[in-house]
């Protein structure tokens, strides 16, 4: 059998051994997601007001969270007045409902989920509550964006709920996690088609 000669091999580039960490600074930000107006049916909508507590939502730790509180308060009060379901959560281990910011104090009878971690569906009756109340749409608001909003909002989408995320009602310790959360929820397979990004003043009932 005749020998086979491979030509041009020396001109092939050497295999790159860099990782995403090495190439981190080369990344370019994608275009920002589009924000869309939303009209909600209060009877089939639940607000998830996640982890707005004295431990997590302070001007020193998360100024964007602290700045969002007046707008979140106004929106929660409007939704409550229209009859929407309001569900709260606390995040820090051993935190209690009394740790929720006074501006966002739950009304009598409104559920407060205990510290459950990033995904509020895990080890809770949240999905059952939503189904029992006839909820089809959830509005995910909270801090941190990359934990409670990303994981609970994403999981709600995977469980078949429509998910509304007002980007001015989610926050983190710095900007990048907020950008990533918005990007992920608006692009991830099986999640993005259930998620709408918006602003609080673009939501009506």
Where are these regions (language model features)?
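Acidic/histidine-rich helix-loop elements
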Residues: 18-26, 57-66
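Acidic/histidine-rich, surface-exposed loop or edge segments in extracytoplasmic proteins
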Residues: 48-59
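A short alpha/beta connector and helix-capping loop motif
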Residues: 61-79, 84-87
């Amino acid at each position: 059998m005749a020998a086979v000669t491979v030509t041009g091999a020396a001109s092939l580039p050497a295999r790159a051994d860099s990782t995403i960490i090495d190439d981190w600074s080369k990344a370019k930000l994608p275009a920002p997601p589009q924000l869309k107006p939303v009209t909600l049916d209060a009877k089939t909508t639940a607000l998830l007001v996640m982890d707005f507590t004295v431990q997590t939502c302070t001007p020193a730790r998360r100024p964007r969270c602290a700045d969002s509180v007046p707008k979140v308060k106004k929106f929660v009060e409007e939704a409550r007045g229209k009859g929407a379901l309001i569900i709260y959560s606390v995040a820090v281990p051993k935190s209690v409902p009394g740790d929720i910011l006074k501006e966002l104090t739950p009304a009598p009878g409104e559920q407060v989920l205990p510290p459950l971690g990033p995904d509020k569906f895990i080890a809770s009756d949240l999905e059952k509550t939503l189904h029992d109340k006839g909820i089809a749409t959830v509005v995910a608001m909270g801090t941190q964006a990359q934990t409670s909003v990303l994981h609970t909002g994403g999981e709600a989408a995977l469980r078949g709920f429509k998910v509304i995320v007002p980007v001015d009602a989610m926050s983190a310790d710095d900007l990048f996690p907020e950008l990533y959360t918005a990007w992920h929820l608006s692009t991830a397979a099986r999640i993005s088609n259930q998620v709408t990004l918006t602003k609080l003043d673009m939501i009506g009932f």
